[in-house]
A protein has these predicted regions:
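Conserved catalytic or regulatory cores that recognize and/or transform ribose-phosphate-containing ligands
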Residues: 1-158
């Protein structure tokens, strides 16, 4: 199998893009292991489940993050959780790639202003898949916590 991917997308922040998440995850699963495939599940619970249950989710998700080779985030629908996951991944030197539909939203300056993140704006879903191929097909991922793969359509290249 290829890379271990942590896919991040809005859950409690809104499920308007859940079908898109499902398609992206299915595409990546052809040659990779998506640790968070449940994010594409249309039937995920959107309600808080209590501190104990949420603590279990936190522990599982952060373990998956630390195990992952790369984080792929779809950020068209704003999400506090996805923002937290991105910051956590940066802290652990996990390469992060952020996709968003620029016809529907703008990213926070906290993301676009941080050169750690590879930003991939798109207008049509079909634009996502060649970029994923480039990201996931690259040989090297980490050098001092930085992405070494070629970046496409980035807002903040290093």
């Amino acid at each position: 199998m290829g890379k271990k991917i942590y896919f991040a997308g809005s859950i409690r922040g809104g499920r308007v893009d859940a079908a898109l998440y499902h398609r992206i995850i299915s595409y990546m699963q052809k040659e990779n292991d998506v640790l968070t495939e449940h994010v594409g599940n249309m039937d995920l619970s959107l309600v808080e489940q209590g501190r104990e249950r949420d603590a279990l989710i936190y522990k599982q998700d952060t373990a998956w993050l630390r195990e992952s080779d790369v984080l792929i985030a779809e950020c068209t629908c704003p999400s506090l959780g996805v923002g937290y996951e991105l910051a956590y991944a940066e802290r652990y030197g996990i390469p992060c790639h952020i996709f968003y539909d620029k016809t529907k939203t703008q990213l926070s300056a906290m993301l676009t202003g941080d050169s750690y993140y590879a930003i991939h704006p798109y207008e049509h879903e079909e634009e996502i898949y060649p970029v994923l191929d480039e990201i996931l097909g690259s040989s090297g991922f980490r050098v001092d916590g930085r992405t070494t793969s070629k970046r496409l359509n980035m807002v903040n290249p290093r």
